[in-house]
């Protein structure tokens, strides 16, 4: 959530910055809400002053032994007016909060202002695209003999699911373990095991709710008892779309000692996405799934450190690609292509030979204080006033897409897969993964 004071001070400037994100700020609505809020607060202050005056007058009259029925009746009316105003103010504050919840983050000044992904800026390219002297297979054809099974997954769950067996399941597990170990030992992240289901407050904290509810898998749970309509009380849980949600929420409603910053976490979890709006896209293979594994990096920093932390975090994800000997490029997203909560984002795109294209394998973002304001995640220096932390996150990496890239870039003429040296210790020293 952006700072409401920015809107109150210069709403035109905020609207202009948001327009670069293809977001039209409803200036008229916000001004109307603010005008009523100010009027109500002024009226409440006036009523409070009047009640204080009446209370003094009542005290003086009673001290003189005089009656104060009229003043007491007036106090009763003032109290009723204050209660009515307080109720309306609470409703109004909720409306303002809902309004703010729907506004995306402001882009950092270093982000190029452009309309869509076609104008993202490539800032780095690493590795040589492999040249094959045989017909290149895609990961579906390569994976089948290694234990990749879409048919049985469709029988069990439906489309956009996979079953991995034998060699390919082992390779998938090895990739995740290699990523976690590298981040924990080389990059000093603390490993976290977190819930795969979270409550609505956690989803609101990181920005998935209320805007992106249709992209989530919701799990209602009966709580016992009935609501006001006689229906059974329920509470919604949500399957996590990324470990960013539970891990970032570790600091929700917390005041962190500045000596503990930065906080660096790594977590390996399954991720669950409905892929609403993705009908017809990447229908073949593992690129777009309802369930997939990801190793996620999260950092909690002081405001002045967050931009350098983004460079560092992105570099940590790049390190995995380089150790896996996978060609990739680093792209700075323009304002029109950034995620809802991001103030600056780098995408890492890995080379996929069968598609003759680079495909996203990691997205690394600084959220500034956007999530922290929603979560009330703060830090304090000594006895000073608490300030909002900055939060960052990035994939380090998406395990399934790393598997896709490894299969295709390291394929051999006989369908076997050459294992990068850094990954071999996680496969018992295996240098080549052969079909079953």
Swiss-Prot record:
In terms of CDD domains, this protein maps to: SerRS_core (cd00770)
- Establish whether keyword S-adenosyl-L-methionine is in the entry: no
Q: Where in the cell is it found?
A: Cytoplasm
Please name one Pfam family that this protein belongs to. Seryl_tRNA_N
Its recorded reaction(s) are: tRNA(Ser) + L-serine + ATP = L-seryl-tRNA(Ser) + AMP + diphosphate + H(+); tRNA(Sec) + L-serine + ATP = L-seryl-tRNA(Sec) + AMP + diphosphate + H(+)
InterPro entries membership = aa-tRNA-synt_IIb, aa-tRNA-synth_II, aa-tRNA-synth_II/BPL/LPL, Ser-tRNA-ligase_type_1, Ser-tRNA-synth_1_N, SerRS_1_N_sf, SerRS_core, tRNA-bd_arm
Binding positions for L-serine per the UniProt entry: 242-244, 296, 395
Q: Please state what class of enzyme this protein is.
A: ligase
Q: What is its EC number?
A: 6.1.1.11
Q: Which GO terms describe its biological process?
A: selenocysteine biosynthetic process; seryl-tRNA aminoacylation
- Gene Ontology MF, one: serine-tRNA ligase activity
Listed A to Z, the keywords are: Aminoacyl-tRNA synthetase, ATP-binding, Cytoplasm, Ligase, Nucleotide-binding, Protein biosynthesis
Give the protein's function.
Answer: Catalyzes the attachment of serine to tRNA(Ser). Is also able to aminoacylate tRNA(Sec) with serine, to form the misacylated tRNA L-seryl-tRNA(Sec), which will be further converted into selenocysteinyl-tRNA(Sec).
Quaternary structure, from the entry: Homodimer. The tRNA molecule binds across the dimer.
The family annotation for this protein states: Belongs to the class-II aminoacyl-tRNA synthetase family. Type-1 seryl-tRNA synthetase subfamily.
Q: What is this protein called?
A: Serine--tRNA ligase
Q: Which organism is it from?
A: Polynucleobacter necessarius subsp. necessarius (strain STIR1)
Q: What is the lineage of its organism?
A: Bacteria, Pseudomonadati, Pseudomonadota, Betaproteobacteria, Burkholderiales
């Amino acid at each position: 959530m952006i700072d409401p004071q920015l809107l109150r001070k210069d709403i035109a400037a905020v609207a202009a910055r948001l327009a670069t994100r293809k977001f039209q700020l409803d200036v008229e609505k916000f001004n109307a809400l603010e005008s009523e809020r100010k009027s109500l607060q002024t009226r409440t202050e006036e009523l409070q002053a009047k009640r204080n005056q009446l209370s003094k007058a009542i005290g003086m009259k009673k001290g003189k032994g005089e009656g104060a029925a009229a003043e007491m009746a007036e106090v009763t009316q003032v109290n009723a007016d204050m209660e009515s105003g307080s109720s309306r103010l609470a409703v109004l504050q909720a409306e303002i909060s809902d309004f703010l919840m729907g506004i995306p983050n402001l882009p950092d000044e270093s982000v190029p202002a452009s309309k869509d992904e076609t104008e993202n800026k490539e800032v780095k390219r690493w590795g040589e695209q492999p040249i094959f002297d045989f017909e290149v297979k895609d990961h579906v054809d390569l994976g089948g003999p290694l234990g990749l099974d879409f048919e049985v997954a469709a029988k069990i769950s439906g489309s956009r699911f996979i079953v991995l067996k034998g060699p390919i399941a082992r390779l998938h597990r090895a990739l995740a373990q290699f990523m976690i170990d590298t981040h924990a030992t080389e990059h000093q992240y603390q490993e976290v095991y977190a819930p795969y289901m979270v409550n609505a407050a956690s989803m609101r904290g990181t920005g998935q709710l209320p805007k992106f509810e249709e992209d989530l898998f919701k799990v209602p749970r009966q709580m016992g008892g009935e609501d006001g309509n006689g229906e059974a009380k329920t509470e919604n849980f949500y399957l996590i779309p990324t470990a960013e949600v539970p891990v970032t929420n570790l600091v929700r409603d917390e005041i962190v000692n500045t000596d503990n910053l930065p906080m660096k976490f790594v977590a390996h979890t399954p991720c669950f996405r409905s892929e609403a709006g993705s009908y017809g896209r990447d229908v073949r293979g593992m690129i777009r799934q309802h369930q997939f594994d990801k190793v996620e990096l999260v950092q909690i920093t002081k405001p002045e450190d967050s931009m350098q932390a983004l460079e560092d975090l992105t570099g940590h994800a790049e390190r995995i690609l380089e150790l896996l000997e996978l060609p990739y490029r680093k792209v700075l997203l323009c304002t029109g292509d950034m995620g809802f909560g991001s103030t600056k984002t780098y995408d890492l795109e890995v080379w996929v030979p069968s598609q003759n294209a680079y495909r996203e394998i990691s997205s690394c973002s600084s959220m500034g204080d956007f999530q922290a304001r929603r979560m009330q995640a703060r830090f304090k220096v000594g006895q000073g006033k608490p300030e909002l932390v900055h939060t960052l996150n990035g994939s380090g990496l998406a395990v399934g897409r790393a598997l896709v890239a490894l299969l295709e870039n390291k394929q051999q003429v006989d369908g076997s897969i050459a294992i990068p040296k850094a990954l071999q210790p996680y496969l018992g020293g295996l240098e080549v993964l052969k079909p079953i």
